[in-house]
Amino acid sequence: MYKLMNGVEIPSIAFGTWKISDENICRKSVKYALECGYRHIDAARIYNNEIFVGKGISEFLKENPNIKREDLFITTKVWNSDQGYEETLKAFEASLERLNLDYIDLYLIHWPNTKNMATTFETWKALEKLYNDKKLGLLEFVTLRNIILKN
């Protein structure tokens, strides 16, 4: 486990779901990963499998009542075409719905919009709003990924 700056702990190894596009395989893989002890599941809207990931999580939790949602760490990402302030807020809500979760632990900007950094900044503002609106309890942590120094 790694302790993040806000005190949230993140499991050091995640089960990634990139390229698992078949519903049955994705759902079963996520469930099996959790059965094997993974507690961090990594998803993204662009992978087109958040619904299947959510089903795997839901089935696992249903069959393992001693493990609660808060014992898991779920990551997903906002894609380039969903960047911008309002767009990111809508994309987040859509991911929550597809995953069938009450909250997401970590929401990332999958790739910065290097052709229009203003869009990336607006996206970041939306992530800050989601994070700072604690009464909603929708998001535990935000960060960037795939950022190169020149960005």
Which residues does each PLM region occupy?
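Glycine/proline-rich, positively charged
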Residues: 83-151
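N-terminal binding-site loop/beta-alpha segment at the start of enzyme catalytic domains
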Residues: 1-72, 102, 122-126, 132
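A cross-family glycoside hydrolase active-site/sugar-binding cleft signature
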Residues: 14-18, 42-44, 75-77, 107-110, ...
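Active-site mouth loops of central-metabolism enzymes
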Residues: 11-24, 76-87, 116-118
